[in-house]
Amino acid sequence: MGPAEQRHAMDTLMIGALSLETSRLALQRSRRPLVRQFAEFEAEESTTVAQVIAEMTGMAPPPLRPVERRLVERLARANGPAFDREYLVGQITAHRQILDVQERYLSAGRNMHHRHLAMLARGRIREHLRELDLLQRSRV
């Protein structure tokens, strides 16, 4: 595995770990059914992507860095609509970052398996960004 593949895997795992942690929190704390549904799907997908990367590379998600841990702690202190707002904003930020990771790899990476993962992930991430935009606008 070359440097581009290592970076692709690690960046995907790192962002996915934060998304998973905040989505688990949203499953417990959100009062909005559609936000909880999104969080459930996101948690399942983040877990699956981490499993795929582990099988491809032997790499596991890293522990959250201090800055990410502080984001989770801040989210955990929020309640009600403020919680949902913070969660959705965080998910949009994370999805934009992970989309950039996939596009960066697709522009230069050559490993077929990583390219396939990046192609599949890119489509789902774009869908998630549209869903997150709708969730931000709705009150359900």
Predicted regions and their residues:
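His/Met- and acidic-residue-enriched segments that coordinate or traffic transition-metal cofactors
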Residues: 1-140
